């Protein structure tokens, strides 16, 4: 194909994403679009087709972005090439959304006709506006009994400030309005603006590791053309590779002769090691490189840290390899080696939130057959010491001794909670209980309120989301962003088993809640840790001071069973002898701590948490 034909084809390319809050129908809409454009035969069609991970199907959520090429014959008779990128809706995966939006010119904004705009809808719209995308509003689920499309239309105009007069009314499930959406994409989403004759410039927006082909790069070509046989160069580290195959996903990979401006597809180039590529890097040709790299992505900083340890310590290196391969596919994951006296060798991992942590742990266990122990998550604290230095601590076990601490600062987040009027009281009560500070409250319309609080991240990390959902019957939605550090009265609480500290069970707590939290955890551990042959005291301590204690009673054999009658001193002698044995055992005995005990520090029951 010569340059002229390529330029004509470029005019017919449309790249767009589907963005929405969780459960507003993104993946179902993507399914209908695939059916409508005959990309997938009805025999191969299945619900949530683009959610290829088992985990995504089970949980009914999208975790990974997915890019796919479709051909659509518009009403004007022309054939257009669409690149559709399905994105996640959960706040933990905002990074995936920002990456997919950088590869598009337009975004289809799906809003539930009954629920209206939610917190994540807004967050994703702002990301789309940052990328200068054309936004096409779609009001979905109009066949629901509670649907009120006109209210949602005014909400879109008032809250987001975009014209919704031409918003498509659709029902992805029933297949209503799908053609109107595709026609709007043709009409309103601009064609890619790159230059076909310029040196190659392509953005890596995702990558996966294939054990046969090495690293497979998912790219969006911004300028130029790339073909098999070309020598490509990574602009961040200058490494070069020979392209072996280029192609697109439709939804299965299909090899092509070239990828040109505006195409969204994949490249394989025998890239063997995971470290050679980075999501957000720019690919160019080695013999005709681009003058400057694309802006790429801002690096995501983890919000939550936890320790991951293999139950079988000999699989430490397998865990390292698994994390490296997962990092290719999940750029927001960070990790570094660490050791624990209780758990041996493992990794300290950083995540964007609890759901992200959960998903990574499950993927490691499923895709790499690892058995893992996870320690309770914690956030990053800044500890100002008496000698004038400041230490950054992400692991409670590394918290300095209380006598050396001048003050401790913890991260706060600005939480936007969208909630129906009836539940405002419940949300405010929960936020106050979690040490939140009220900032402001806006009425979006007669039914919905946007409540803004500043809350310590450590409180959000534990169980805020679950509690928010249960106290508002699932109607509230949450979005949060960092709001800096503040000084708080925090202390480190150690858990002692049989008078020995278990470093993996330590956690940071606000001084006002230390006593209740310590007491609750000690009681919980007492139930979870199996009884031993000797009595085991479980203690919670701040520094040298014990604040709570509970004893796990010993299992004991009835040594008097064979002692029929006889003198009482004989019975006493047997009991004393047993007592001596237990004492000796206690000095050398070690206590096995089950995985549930580590998670107990995390998930305290409601009555434990009445704080």
From Swiss-Prot:
Residues 11-193 form the tr-type G domain. GTP binds at residues 23-28, 140-143. InterPro entries: EF-4 (IPR006297), EFG_III/V (IPR035647), EFG_V-like (IPR000640), EFTu-like_2 (IPR004161), G_TR_CS (IPR031157), LepA_C_sf (IPR038363), LepA_CTD (IPR013842), LepA_IV (IPR035654). Coiled coil: none annotated. GO terms for cellular component: plasma membrane. It catalyses: GTP + H2O = GDP + phosphate + H(+). Belongs to the TRAFAC class translation factor GTPase superfamily. Classic translation factor GTPase family. LepA subfamily. It is found in: Cell membrane. It holds the Pfam family LepA_C. This is Elongation factor 4. HAMAP family: LepA (MF_00071). GO terms for biological process: positive regulation of translation. Disulfide bonds: none annotated. It is a peripheral membrane protein. CDD domains: EF4_II, EF4_III, LepA, lepA_C. Its EC number is 3.6.5.n1. The keyword Nucleotide-binding applies. Keywords: Cell membrane, GTP-binding, Hydrolase, Membrane, Nucleotide-binding, Protein biosynthesis. Required for accurate and efficient protein synthesis under certain stress conditions. May act as a fidelity factor of the translation reaction, by catalyzing a one-codon backward translocation of tRNAs on improperly translocated ribosomes. Back-translocation proceeds from a post-translocation (POST) complex to a pre-translocation (PRE) complex, thus giving elongation factor G a second chance to translocate the tRNAs correctly. Binds to ribosomes in a GTP-dependent manner. It comes from the Bacteria. One of its GO terms (molecular function) is GTPase activity.
